[in-house]
């Protein structure tokens, strides 16, 4: 296992839809997948993240790992991996997100957070690390995480979903940090935690 660099907004791998993880006729997964998943967990844990998509570490495959509580206030923590996820959600509100309840951050936009409109409920179906079907469903923070990580795999960052003044603030943050160009990354444990955990 290894902690690997996390790509920063502007890297093409973050802005390109990922490819499905190949599944053999017998349901088998690639032999090197366990090592990738282990590296993703270690990197996510070192970064104090609640989720990490494969393309955030430069691997353009459709899977993410997570370690997320049900709500912002806590509740049961869920940890796992979803391979080739398919997302369903309730309706996404068209109003401006609440700055207190809808704050969202991303390891690929380190240290920044912005109110982001998300559906209140989400479900993801896919495969677990053993190639068995898995369904995850939740509300609140868990639903937000499912939408956020699946969005990564579709080639979008949460800042791409921002509207109004929040979108303008995110563009300013990207510019002022010198992001938005290929080749930038940060490695958890080698730099201070950008979110101050």
Swiss-Prot record:
The question of whether Transcription regulation is a record keyword is answered with no
User: Superkingdom of this entry's organism?
Assistant: Bacteria
The Swiss-Prot or TrEMBL record annotates one GO molecular function as:
metal ion binding
Q: Which Pfam families match?
A: Pep_deformylase (PF01327)
Needed cofactors, names only, are: Fe(2+)
* Annotated Fe cation binding sites: 106, 148, 152
Q: Mind listing the GO biological process terms from this record?
A: co-translational protein modification; translation
What does it do? Removes the formyl group from the N-terminal Met of newly synthesized proteins. Requires at least a dipeptide for an efficient rate of reaction. N-terminal L-methionine is a prerequisite for activity but the enzyme has broad specificity at other positions.
- Family affiliation: Belongs to the polypeptide deformylase family.
Q: What is this protein called?
A: Peptide deformylase
